[in-house]
């Protein structure tokens, strides 16, 4: 299956189980892999034959920056739901969400989740 990839999208949001996360917010890193049939676009060179990743980015940004979720698992699920609703050609989605600085003790590069959904 063909894929459209958005990697390292950075957004500021207020998601998390801790009060500090909900009031102070933090940066969220989002990676997306969208399974789409790109056959027509690969032949036509027309934007109308693909999924516009700029619009995908804006859609995800609105959810991450405008919504509030306790769990990033739920945020990821909401991203999948929204993208499936907005873009019928998307057949499957893999989304990864990471927090670089959650309020937990320890040394790590990031913590996060990854989920995959199919239409």
Swiss-Prot record:
Report the InterPro entries cross-referenced here.
Dihydroneopterin_aldolase (IPR006156), FolB_dom (IPR006157), GTP-CH-I_C/QueF (IPR043133)
Residues at which substrate binds: 21, 53, 72-73
Catalytic activity field: 7,8-dihydroneopterin = 6-hydroxymethyl-7,8-dihydropterin + glycolaldehyde
Pfam families hit by this protein? FolB
Q: Does the keyword Acyltransferase apply?
A: no
Pathway assigned to this chain's UniProt record: Cofactor biosynthesis; tetrahydrofolate biosynthesis; 2-amino-4-hydroxy-6-hydroxymethyl-7,8-dihydropteridine diphosphate from 7,8-dihydroneopterin triphosphate: step 3/4
**Which source organism does the UniProt entry give?**
Streptococcus pyogenes serotype M3 (strain ATCC BAA-595 / MGAS315)
Protein name (Swiss-Prot/TrEMBL): Dihydroneopterin aldolase
PANTHER family assigned: DIHYDRONEOPTERIN ALDOLASE 1-RELATED
> What Enzyme Commission number(s) apply to this enzyme?
4.1.2.25
Known Gene3D superfamilies for this protein? 3.30.1130.10
Tell me the function of this protein. Answer: Catalyzes the conversion of 7,8-dihydroneopterin to 6-hydroxymethyl-7,8-dihydropterin.
Tell me the keywords, alphabetical order: Folate biosynthesis, Lyase
Q: CDD domains, alphabetically? A: DHNA_DHNTPE
Task: Cite the active-site annotation.
Answer: 99
Name any GO cellular component annotation.
Answer: cytoplasm
What family name appears in the similarity comment? Belongs to the DHNA family.
- GO BP field: folic acid biosynthetic process; tetrahydrofolate biosynthetic process
List the molecular function annotations (GO) for this entry.
Answer: dihydroneopterin aldolase activity
């Amino acid at each position: 299956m063909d894929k459209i990839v958005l990697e390292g999208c950075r957004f500021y949001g207020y998601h998390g189980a801790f009060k500090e996360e909900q009031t102070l917010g933090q940066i969220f890193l989002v990676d997306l892999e969208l399974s789409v049939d790109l056959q027509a676009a690969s032949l036509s060179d027309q934007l109308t034959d693909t999924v516009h990743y700029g619009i995908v980015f804006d859609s995800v940004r609105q959810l991450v920056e405008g919504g509030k979720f306790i769990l990033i698992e739920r945020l990821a699920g909401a991203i999948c739901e929204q993208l499936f609703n907005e873009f019928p050609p998307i057949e499957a989605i893999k989304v990864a969400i990471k927090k670089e600085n959650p309020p937990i003790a320890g040394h790590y590069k990031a913590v996060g989740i990854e989920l995959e959904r199919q239409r």
